[in-house]
């Protein structure tokens, strides 16, 4: 074997080794409008994290223990979910596998959306909508009570670049990324996509109950 061939084999071997040893990709999530996050979640609550600890949560297919972080919480209000208050929230132990870090001590309030696990428990990931309560707009806070639920039959389509279009009347085009280069823009903060009497969907501004007929954008 010539020197060039040996060099090539060595380079390929090093490349393969680097690939095998490369850390897992970080958690990746598609942006969603707050209304979508509300509609997709089993549970949506306002809460504080009181304490946290690492707990075992069964075993993987190889018999290795699965670790999760358990947050004991104080629920302030439930906007969507079971009749029983949520007492514990579970998440993965690292952000690389979509684990969520909450401030503990009971001082910081959060809006937390996630999946129900039953018996006063829920599970959250970085792909769920979890934000400090005081960062929400007044419209967002009010929409949690009724407005977002009214739009769960509508579809919000994110526009990543111009041109973009809706493909059916029950869609609303989410333009924040194009207009503001920010997914937490004006439509996310102040608008909800609501079904109209003719079955189509349109953006509605504000949190007061809409008229039976309303335009695509209506001031409160």
From Swiss-Prot:
InterPro entries: Netrin_domain, TIMP, TIMP-like_OB-fold, TIMP_C, TIMP_CS. Zn(2+) binds at residue 27. Residues 27-30, 95-96 are annotated as: Involved in metalloproteinase-binding. It comes from the Eukaryota. The keyword Metal-binding applies. The record marks 40, 61, 67 as: Involved in metalloproteinase-binding. Induction: Down-regulated by TGFB1. Residues 27-152 form the NTR domain. Keywords: Disulfide bond, Metal-binding, Metalloenzyme inhibitor, Metalloprotease inhibitor, Protease inhibitor, Secreted, Signal, Zinc. SMART domains: NTR (SM00206). Residues 1-26 form the signal peptide. The activity of TIMP2 is dependent on the presence of disulfide bonds. PROSITE patterns: NTR, TIMP. One of its GO terms (biological process) is response to cytokine. GO terms for molecular function: metalloendopeptidase inhibitor activity; molecular function inhibitor activity; peptidase inhibitor activity; protease binding; zinc ion binding. It is found in: Secreted. Disulfide bonds join 27-98, 29-127, 39-152, 154-201, 159-164, 172-193. Interacts (via the C-terminal) with MMP2 (via the C-terminal PEX domain); the interaction inhibits the MMP2 activity. Belongs to the protease inhibitor I35 (TIMP) family. Complexes with metalloproteinases (such as collagenases) and irreversibly inactivates them by binding to their catalytic zinc cofactor. Known to act on MMP-1, MMP-2, MMP-3, MMP-7, MMP-8, MMP-9, MMP-10, MMP-13, MMP-14, MMP-15, MMP-16 and MMP-19. This is Metalloproteinase inhibitor 2. It comes from Homo sapiens (Human).
């Amino acid at each position: 074997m010539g020197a060039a061939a040996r060099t090539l084999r060595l380079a390929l071997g090093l490349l393969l080794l680097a690939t095998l040893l490369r850390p897992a990709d970080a958690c990746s999530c598609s942006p969603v409008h707050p209304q979508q996050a509300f509609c997709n979640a089993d549970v949506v609550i306002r809460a504080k994290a009181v304490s946290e600890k690492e707990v075992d949560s069964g075993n993987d297919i190889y018999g290795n223990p699965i670790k999760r972080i358990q947050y004991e919480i104080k629920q302030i209000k439930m906007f969507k979910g079971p009749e029983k208050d949520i007492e514990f929230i579970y998440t993965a132990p690292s952000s690389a596998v979509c684990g969520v870090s909450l401030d503990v001590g009971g001082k910081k309030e959060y809006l937390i959306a996630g999946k129900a696990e039953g018996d006063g428990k829920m599970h959250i990931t970085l792909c769920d909508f979890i934000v400090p309560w005081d960062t929400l707009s007044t419209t967002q806070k009010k929409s949690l009570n009724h407005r977002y639920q009214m739009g769960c039959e509508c579809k919000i389509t994110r526009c990543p670049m111009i041109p973009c279009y809706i493909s059916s009347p029950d869609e609303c085009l989410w333009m924040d990324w194009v207009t503001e280069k920010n997914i937490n823009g004006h439509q996310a903060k102040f608008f909800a996509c609501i079904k109209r009497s003719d079955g189509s969907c349109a953006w509605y501004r504000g949190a007061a109950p809409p008229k039976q007929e309303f335009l695509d954008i209506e001031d409160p």
